[in-house]
Amino acid sequence: FAHEVAKRYPHITVALHTDHCAKQYLDGWVRPLLDMEADEVAHGREPMFQSHMWDGSTVPLDENLAIAEQLLDKSVAARTILEIEIGAVGGEEDGHSAEINEKLYSTPADGVKVAQRLGLGERGRYMAAFTFGNVHGSYKPGVVKLRPELLGDIQREAAQAVVDGRIASAAGAVDFPNGKP
């Protein structure tokens, strides 16, 4: 349906994205979609989705990246973009929850590992959703401690390379005077 609607509005970019696919759903959801899309592309057609999200936030980083490597290869064949979640997002979403603690903060070492395992775009296009204290849900002021400076630290440590990034759930975000923290 979305593809047909998009044809009527060529001046608007329409992109379809699968969001938050946890490990237990990969074999019944994202992997079959990527295989189907690779077949479509091989036959000269467009993929159904433009991007897919692998949410490895509940597994150890090395396992997360091993799965991400496999999915990135499939994503390249399907001409899609892979989004990976690095670190735990606090709060609750889709039946998964994480406490509000230090695990909510990705580290520069995490960014380096991502770049080492997935490359800097030469292996395929991906977005890395690093966590910096972001949470799902609403919280009283002061409960959520966002540390967006971590994103700059991660980028610098990952060989000063630009890795497409995404902010996963911005609950707790505040307006800064003059647009600066």
Predicted feature descriptions by range:
Residues P181:
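Conserved phosphate/anionic-ligand binding catalytic regions in large, soluble enzymes, centered on
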